[in-house]
Amino acid sequence: MRIIMRHYLSIFQQAVRNRWDKPALSDYKGETFTFADMATQIAKHHVLFEKVGLKPGDKVALASKNCARWAISFLAVGTYRAVAVPILPDFAPDTIGELANHSESVILFTEARIWEAIDKSKETTLKAVISVDDFSVLCAADETLAESVAAEQAKMPKVYPAEQKNEVSDYKIGDINDLAIINYTSGTSGFSKGVMIPYRAIASNLEFGRKVLPQINNTSKVVSMLPCAHMYGLMFEVLYELSSGSHVHFLSRLPSPKVILQALAEVKPTIVVAVPLIIEKIYKNKVKPVLEKAGIKFAMKVPGLDHIVINKIKNELI
């Protein structure tokens, strides 16, 4: 039997309209964007793209820390039918520049500190570099770009009203087999490889997510701690949640056990998506010291008491 999958952007579009005035993206202890805010910022990105001359199928690189604005820029690229190129911000600045050129990216979204460290003497395919911190123009081939974009965006409302939500989120959704992402990862050999990911793969993972994570819905919250430049974190801490109308909280700082546990306690996420390294850090720093106490060691050997201890540790963690 042939399974017909919905295009991710079609599902995202529906979520935007259904959850218009509800929170969509937050930076932990920072700014929050509702679905309306997000849709407005996406529309403003599209103005920038038009001024740069970006065309469907063109590449746009993103290299910055995890944050709400990274997600907005990523979604703006897809809803413009361009191809997103996520790059780990931990890579050396010149490597980021090389990957942007290797992918033939026309625009780079990054942090000012990263852009300042990239070698500008090399030939580049980039026509514009945009700050992820505030969406300002850091550099452009057209010296009038910042001024012309600002003038056009000034005509737009600060946030589009609900009456215009269908119009502002009327995204030009392409074919499900279109290229969505070129993902650069270090790989086992240590050299970055550009993996070409079509929307079909994203749609397939959404279907998988609905089967294994049915508890995620429009009341759910998640703490995004994995790199958005890696597909696991991007898919199951951001894209799947937004398509469900959930609220994503980004840890934009180093995800140390202390910061992670503090965020989990405050946000109270519906699920926690992690990798073994993070779980191991939490265990070594928070769980193991408790279990090694003399009284606790004894309690863990007594039927009934062991469950009380485990539940107490669990409640203190989350």
Stretches with model-predicted labels:
Residues P89-S121, N205-V223, S256-T270, E316:
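Conserved ATP-dependent adenylate/AMP-binding module captured primarily in the ANL superfamily
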Residues F12-Q13, E50, A68-I87, I96-G97, ...:
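Hydrophobic alpha-helical segments in the ANL/AMP-binding
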Residues A203-K221, C228-K312:
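Conserved AMP-binding/adenylation subdomain of ANL enzymes
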Residues T34-A36, A180-L206:
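Conserved AMP-binding A3 loop
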